[in-house]
From Swiss-Prot:
One of its GO terms (cellular component) is plasma membrane. It comes from Desulfotalea psychrophila (strain LSv54 / DSM 12343). Its EC number is 2.4.2.-, 2.4.2.22. Keywords: Cell inner membrane, Cell membrane, Glycosyltransferase, Magnesium, Membrane, Metal-binding, Purine salvage, Transferase. SUPFAM superfamilies: PRTase-like. Its cofactor is Mg(2+). Homotetramer. Mg(2+) binds at D94. Pathway: Purine metabolism; GMP biosynthesis via salvage pathway; GMP from guanine: step 1/1; Purine metabolism; XMP biosynthesis via salvage pathway; XMP from xanthine: step 1/1. It is found in: Cell inner membrane. This is Xanthine-guanine phosphoribosyltransferase. Belongs to the purine/pyrimidine phosphoribosyltransferase family. XGPT subfamily.
């Protein structure tokens, strides 16, 4: 986690499931989607939940690498693209942060409906639908990036 982040926001599997289902609820009144494009890796779990809720069986991926295990990388690498302009497709990611990945994907698939579970202010204008806004200086701890362990109470953390 780089120095630009002042807070952390841990998300449990249960919360991610609830928030992904809430995103699916918001997408119900949109046009019919012929399939989902999950941005790997973060978009895969939300995409599976949304696919179930919207009864979508066709799922593809686009692979963009913009983070290493610790922090953002300098460039976004396209590891696997998508054929077509995205018309009729639902593009899913876990989070839009600075918008760098979103810009790359929107240029590749400009007609897809872009939805994320979480959005930060810098990237929010690039998505069509999202559920929860998180401050720009917050690092989100997704459940696939964490292990269960003791955490000090908030009051104890502030006194350090």
């Amino acid at each position: 986690m780089s120095d630009q982040y002042k807070r952390t926001y841990p998300i449990s599997w249960d919360q991610l499931h609830r928030d992904s289902k809430a995103l699916a609820w918001r997408l119900l009144d949109k046009d019919f989607f012929k399939g989902i494009i999950a941005i790997t890796r973060g978009g895969m779990v939300p995409a599976a939940i949304i696919a179930r809720e919207l009864d979508i069986h066709l799922i593809d991926t686009i692979c963009i690498s913009s983070y290493d295990w610790k922090e953002k990388k300098g460039e976004a690498d396209i590891l696997k693209g998508f054929d077509g302009d995205g018309e009729g497709w639902l593009l899913i990611d876990d989070l839009v942060d600075t918008g760098r990945t979103a810009e790359v994907v929107k240029n590749l698939i400009p007609k897809a409906h872009f939805a994320t579970v979480y959005a930060k202010p810098s990237g929010r204008p690039l998505v069509d639908t999202f559920v929860t806004e998180v401050s720009q200086d917050t690092w989100i701890l997704f459940p696939w990036d964490t292990e269960s362990q003791f955490a000090a109470p908030l009051i104890g953390r502030e006194q350090r």
